[in-house]
Design a protein with these regions (language model features):
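Acidic, metal/ion-coordinating pockets
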Residues: 1-213
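Alpha-helical scaffold elements within enzyme catalytic domains, especially in hydrolases
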Residues: 9-12, 116, 266, 274, ...
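Histidine-centered divalent metal-coordination motifs
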Residues: 22-23, 129, 151-154, 268, ...
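Short, glycine/serine-rich, charged loops/turns that create anion-binding
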Residues: 86-88, 131-132, 305, 333, ...
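Acidic, Ser/Thr/Pro-rich beta/coil linker or hinge segments at domain junctions
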Residues: 207-227
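Sequence context of c-type cytochrome heme-c attachment sites
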Residues: 220, 226-347, 364-383
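A contiguous, mid-protein "functional segment" used to position or interact
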Residues: 346-360
Length: 383
């Protein structure tokens, strides 16, 4: 559902090229082919290949012509694109007639494909689904790449973890400029090419714009996204309700587990009172209002311990772990009353940016937000 909505949105925005990463093949080759038919843009990849021949399963490169205008003058520029994704030795997908799809080394694939692309393009752009370290190696191995546009494809990285500020916004290696996309489509990158009198690309001007609430949504695209978000939430709800209504087994006694904020209030009464008046104590209501209470991408920052052993499961089984309670920041506390330790649960403001990322919380300013949730001073005064 989400992929179909993304394709619809990319069509509406006039995308011309997209890099084929392993995620597009997660549901199998046949599903990808059907989605490819819906796309009004081209998928490229030089290192997702047929195992028997070593040939890419889609075009490895493509050229897009763009007309640049400066007053009465105009120039047609040929932009050459190559797609590269991380090499996963364990990746293996079945294709038609028993053929299999694998990945090969992206740097070697680039070396193989770029000589031909150089003959057809004025500027070469590499679209990469690589971690930053690999992306840095690309311009060292392959010359004449003018721009590298990247998105992180590290296994296990969630939407919450893949943040724009994980990477340099504008890092230059040799002649190539390396820029990484943010998460959730909330960052707009603008690149302006500058050509000299001979018509050659001499430099480029780059800017990254955070799409905060100051930028209104496109009504049509907002409707598409709202529809798919509600549909995904409903699907997740049905899957969750089909599971056992009972909570997961309690971890062994040797391990601390989550208990819920009410238990903390027995000793930390004043701190609990301050917390109860904060927006953290009502964080789950935000999901309910947006029909996203079953969205696994949202739950880690609106509940206690979602995805962790003994953490939040669903409203029926773990109602005590709803909202951003004490243990969401300070950790599981079941053993704390009996084994009080100095420094238990101690955190600092750096912990806040786990959830208050630029994508999820664009208005977050520590100096303004922290005073709204301060409760540790009151608790200390009581002692």
């Amino acid at each position: 559902m989400q992929t179909d909505a993304l394709i619809e949105g990319m069509n509406a925005l006039g995308y011309k090229v997209a890099n084929l990463s392993l995620r597009e093949l997660s549901h199998g080759y046949d599903v990808f082919v059907e989605r490819q038919k819906k796309a009004r843009f081209e998928f490229v990849s030089a290192n997702v290949v047929w195992q028997d021949s070593g040939e890419p399963i889609v075009a490895p490169t493509t050229v897009v012509k763009a007309t640049l205008r400066d007053g009465a003058r105009s120039k047609t520029v040929r932009l050459g694109f190559i797609g590269l994704t991380r090499n996963d030795p364990a990746f293996l997908k079945e294709g038609p007639k028993g053929r299999r799809i694998v990945t090969v080394d992206p740097l070697s694939a680039a070396e193989k494909q770029l000589p031909a692309l150089r003959q057809k393009a004025d500027v070469i752009v590499a679209l990469v689904a690589l971690d930053l370290q690999q992306a840095r190696q690309l311009p060292k191995r392959v010359k004449d790449i003018g721009l590298i546009l990247g998105a992180d494809s590290t296994p296990g990285r969630t939407a919450m973890m893949t943040r724009t500020d994980d990477f340099p916004e504008d890092t230059e290696f040799g002649r190539a400029h390396l820029l990484y996309a943010g998460d959730q489509g909330k960052v707009l990158g603008e690149i302006r090419l500058v050509f000299d009198a001979k018509g050659a690309a001499s430099s480029n001007q780059r800017s990254i714009i955070q799409l905060t609430r100051e930028w209104p949504d496109d009504p049509k695209l907002a409707e598409v996204m709202e529809t798919v978000k509600v549909a995904i939430n409903q699907y997740n709800k049905e899957q969750t309700l089909a599971m056992s209504p009972f909570a997961a087994p309690t971890p062994p006694p040797a391990e601390a587990t989550y208990t819920g904020s009410d238990r903390c209030a027995l000793c930390h009464e004043q701190a609990f009172t301050v917390w109860a008046k904060s927006s953290h104590a009502h964080a789950f209501q935000t999901l309910l209002s947006a029909h996203q209470e079953y969205n696994p991408k949202c739950l880690p920052c609106h509940t206690i311990g979602f995805g962790q052993r003994g953490g939040y499961l669903n409203p029926q089984a773990t109602s005590n772990l709803i909202n951003v309670g004490c243990e969401a920041c300070h950790g599981p506390s079941s053993r704390h009353p009996e084994q009080i330790e100095a420094g238990f649960g101690r955190i600092d403001v750096s912990s806040c940016v786990t959830c208050h990322t630029r994508e999820n919380s664009p208005d977050y300013v520590p100096a303004e937000y922290i005073p709204k949730v301060i409760h540790w001073k009151e608790a200390q005064t009581k002692r």
